[in-house]
Amino acid sequence: MLQICNFLHNFSHLLVIYAPNLIEFREFKTQGDFMKKIIALSTVAFLSTALYADAAMQKQIDELTKKLEVMEKKQDRNIQKIGEVNALAAKDNIKFDVDFRTSYDNLQYKTASGQKYKNDGLYSNRLWLGMGYAPTDTMVFKGQLAYHKAFGAAANSSSGMPQRGMGFDTFDWISSEALNDDKLRVREVYWLWTPTVGSFPMTVSVGRRPSTGGYLVNLRDDDTSKSPMGHVINMEFDGASAGVSLDKFVTGMNFKLCLGRGLTNAKSWANQADSATQVNMQTPTSPNYIKEDGALDTIDMAGFIFVPYDDGQYAVSTTWYRGFNVPGLTYGGSTNPANPAAPHIMALKTVGDMDGMAISAKVEGIGDGINDFLDETILFASFAASITHPDNITSHMTPMGPVQAATMLGSTDSETGTSFWLGAQLPNLTGGKFGLEYNHGSKYWRPFTYGEDTMIGSKLAARGDAYEAYWTQPLIKDVFSMQVRYTYIKYKYTGSDGFFGDGGTPMTMSEAQAMGMDPVEKAQDIRVYFRYRY
């Protein structure tokens, strides 16, 4: 084709050049014949030139196409190599993230008699160092190290001196939540397997599970929701979970079985050494890690989380659990057996089992595209209950004499407590979030919320009324933020933050005063924090 175009192109140009000479020796019948010849020759010249240009362009296009095909093949090979490198890097390296918060808290307390206590300036630092590793698409390792410490302070156990007094700062359930020393502690560490069995996506996980900052609590805490429902569970523990997605039947439906262990009854390594009679040496006479009689029984927990519906805007979640062999402070021996009215020692003993349950509903976005404000508004409501099952077998002493049955929350009967919780989170003009919350607890209400992020005790455990308002504001994108929070609790009964024994006995303020006590009736915490996350 290209050769034909070249011939026609050259021939037409020759005709145009020599046509004037040729027509001098020819005769034309009319001037019109002469013009027709000229037009014909010009047309041939134009068409041949255009045809030649099209063919040349086609040749260039063909050459470029071949070059592009070669480049695409090289690019595909490069992309494959880059993917292999990225996959190798992801599998060979643990990825870290940092969450560092500096807080100021102003604490105010008022007792039933009107006595006031305060701390005008409690400063603290909290560090969460997260880590993750995904060797395959269905297997993930997750971990988080934590440090939470008051400025310049050390825990009692650090030096043996009571720099901050006695307490339960190092109790395992809250060791990373309460103010402690300057050591990094393992707050979370677990593996997560996400297989698909049949057509059902599943999850299986074992380790120190993410059991604080759960559902709905995460809104105020400005975090992604963790596994448990925050109305009843907010504490650290070791355990396992197995879940299945039932989304093919109902939108967002899923079921998860949860198991946990809050304490292990086992003696320590080389726990006892007695002097041997035959040889002059110390010899261990008790095997390692066996069960120890008289100590707290192993504390276990079993339950489930069932989400019947969740479409991203409307969601309902339910949970039930039982805590086995939960502990409580019970009356021990008298400090003066000869005087029945003398003070009695409180001992931590196993007191029974505890059931808990909750149902929570959340609306994330009011209406359907009415306006941005309603689209970003979140409303929620939650109802929960707790039921005691006392053992009634541990003997203890009271000012009235020996009693053969230890109480559970001050009662030898099974008691039921209830709580409801309402909240709203609203967007503001500065890109932040403004929240309001209210909760109420009854006389025998007792959740497992010891790890709640407050300095005045768990507001969700309050036997009375709690009010809270907060403003969370991003300062530098999603990397640096601040929050101002006000929490106010008015207790109707004592024992809100106690364990499950006599120390958790509910009494009205007047009943407690009649027994010579002066319990806290009102508490408030004003908090300001700045938080860096990357």
Map each language-model feature to its residues:
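Transmembrane beta-strands of outer-membrane beta-barrel pores
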Residues: T102-Q108, Y147-F151, R208-T212, L246, ...
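C-terminal structural cap/anchor segments
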Residues: A405-I476
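Surface-exposed loop and membrane-interface regions of Gram-negative outer-membrane beta-barrel proteins
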Residues: S103-R126, G132-P201, S211-H231, H344-K349, ...
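Signature for the C-terminal beta-barrel architecture of outer-membrane proteins
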Residues: V197-T203, L219, D223-N428, F434, ...
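N-terminal periplasmic/intermembrane-space "pro-region" immediately following the signal or transit peptide
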Residues: F11, Y18-I23, F28-G32, K36-K116, ...
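Outer-membrane beta-barrel "beta-signal"
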Residues: D518-Y534
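Membrane-embedded beta-strand positions of outer-membrane beta-barrel proteins
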Residues: V98, G143, V204-V206, F255-L257, ...
